[in-house]
């Protein structure tokens, strides 16, 4: 997941966003079959970013990583739970 971490940091820098923080890896609750448990997915939080900024963040990370990764900015009713999900997709 090193390429994902580097891409997230680079995208945040380019977009002038707060420093992202890894919020979930393989030691938290995820759905059955989650790639987090296989060390193939990470979630990143950027404090106080708008949904529009999150969508731009998603697009930039996806552009940097190219194919082979799924990048999703997930939004929740409680906006403090919004985060960027990045997973390696070997399919």
For the regions a language model picked out, list residue spans one by one.
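Extended, low-complexity, intrinsically disordered C-terminal regulatory tails
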Residues: 1-33
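Catalytic cores and adjacent binding grooves of peptidoglycan-active enzymes
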Residues: 29-34, 38-91
